[in-house]
Amino acid sequence: MSQPTLFIDRDGTLIDEPKTDFQIDSLEKLKLERNVIPALLKLKDHYRFVMVSNQDGLGTDSFPQENFDKPHNAMLEIFRSQGIEFDAILICPHKPEDNCDCRKPKIKLLKKYIDKKLFDPAHSFVIGDRATDVQLAENLGIQALQYHPEKLDWDLIVEKLLPKTTACERPPRYAEVVRTTKETDIKVQVWLDETGVNQISTGVGFFDHMLDQIATHGGFRMNVQCKGDLWIDEHHTVEDTALALGTALKQALGDKRGIQRFGFVLPMDECKAECTMDLSGRPYFKFKAKFKREKVGDFSTEMTEHFFQSIAYTLMATLHLKTQGDNDHHKIESLFKVFGRTLRQCIKVEGNELPSSKGVL
């Protein structure tokens, strides 16, 4: 039966991986990653767990089977004692030079799950600490969460996989906007009181990454799907996505009762990006940034200003943005990040009063 599934790496993700020899071949080396057990306990009612691991030279003189089995079985027993079970444990014992067809990121180990359609691609993930885990996810057609003990630990993974409503006493602040023209076909969904995995696909890779920065730093979740006339250029895709996203944010905010309304973030990152915002209902936009390059990846740098201008007018917000620095990629990214952080302040619910002496926003 197709169901949400987490394909989880072992070394460096579930348990610590020694940086000396990259082998857990004794009980002394066995150490669980921080908060992995509480995280898996929260996730187990929502996902099936499948362990997928490369173990270089397992069963050879360089890594005897019995040396692997002792800490591995001890790890499994710890998990079982806490009510955590794996549907399967799939291990490739080969070294890279063996050129096998089962070593991650190749997918032969998961043949049963693929052939029998046992996992739901829309709600399944690969969790691992290496680039090979990210590539495995791409080969499976699902998303990856690249574990990192500081940047994306198990607590954050749970937060992404189990969206939670932070304003339970209020109706969910959700909006869906569909915008179809001769140039683009767009669907935007926003959940202002949830965090989780953002599903974003516009056909412009750098732009997808920038949109994800808005939601991530804004503390909300969103899905953006856009099919545009990219055979011409990305202008309509970027502009129309901004218009749809601004409209969705405005609709999700409702009457704006209880929100903080104002937000500002002073210089952040190496690029010194600044943002001031007022969800005033009166659109105004001011932008100050200079770019040396015509494009960053597949994204025209001139579309940065146009994106924020478009979103300011459909969001009906006063927006001031500026950045300075040396690297155009970093400057653009800093603007999307600082916009997200400022928006996070503005949409935060503080009470039930309307933040306006006029009685309307």
Swiss-Prot record:
Its cofactor is Mg(2+); Zn(2+). One of its GO terms (cellular component) is cytoplasm. Residues 1-172 are annotated as: Histidinol-phosphatase. Residues 173-361 are annotated as: Imidazoleglycerol-phosphate dehydratase. GO terms for molecular function: histidinol-phosphatase activity; imidazoleglycerol-phosphate dehydratase activity; metal ion binding. Its main location: cytoplasm. Keywords: Amino-acid biosynthesis, Cytoplasm, Histidine biosynthesis, Hydrolase, Lyase, Magnesium, Metal-binding, Multifunctional enzyme, Zinc. Its EC number is 3.1.3.15, 4.2.1.19. It holds the Pfam family IGPD. This is Histidine biosynthesis bifunctional protein HisB. The gene is hisB.
